[in-house]
């Protein structure tokens, strides 16, 4: 995302870069079981671990992850290239209330207007970043 070939003002309505229009947040299903998530999400199932379910990404998202605690969805997230962090920060700041940057974790933190949802944007290893959604 170092630049956008062919980008002009008409393509950049609402100050959202064209590539970020391809960002689709995961369907948040707090409290749902593994079976309910598998049956409900619009993504292709790609695997599981003891604590998570993995689904193929869409658009710029490489993978969607649903994390479970006590066999219920605790959080979910999208994994994408860390090249999108700057643009995602700007984009998420338009959608949610930007709260703070946590330098030790290199994490941007946001909250929904109704304060029901917390969102974290942070880098992972190997050139990847995560956007994680948690119920407050």
Task: Write out the residue ranges for each language-model feature.
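Short Gly/Thr-rich strand-loop-strand
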Residues: 92-113
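Edge beta-strand at a domain terminus
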Residues: 127-136
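C-terminal motif of bacterial Sec signal peptides marking the signal peptidase cleavage site
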Residues: 2-6
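Beta-strand residues in well-ordered beta-sheet regions across diverse protein folds
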Residues: 76-77, 120, 132
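Short, exposed beta-strand-loop hairpins at the edges of beta-sheets
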Residues: 108-128
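Short helix/turn-capping signatures at newly exposed starts of structured segments
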Residues: 7-94, 136
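Assembly/interface hotspot detector across virion components, adhesins/toxins, and nucleic-acid enzymes
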Residues: 45-46, 96-101, 121
């Amino acid at each position: 995302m170092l630049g956008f070939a062919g980008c002009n003002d008409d393509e950049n309505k609402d100050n959202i870069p064209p590539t970020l229009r391809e960002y689709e947040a995961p369907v948040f299903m707090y409290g749902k079981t593994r079976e309910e998530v598998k049956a409900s999400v619009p993504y292709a199932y790609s695997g599981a671990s003891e604590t998570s379910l993995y689904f193929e990404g869409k658009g710029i998202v490489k993978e969607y992850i649903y994390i479970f605690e006590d066999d219920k969805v605790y959080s979910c997230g999208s994994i994408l290239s860390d090249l999108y962090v700057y643009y995602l920060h700007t984009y998420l700041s338009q959608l949610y209330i930007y709260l703070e940057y946590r330098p030790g974790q290199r994490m941007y933190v946001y909250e929904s207007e109704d304060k029901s949802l917390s969102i974290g944007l942070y880098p992972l290893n190997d050139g990847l970043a995560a956007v994680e959604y948690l119920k407050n």
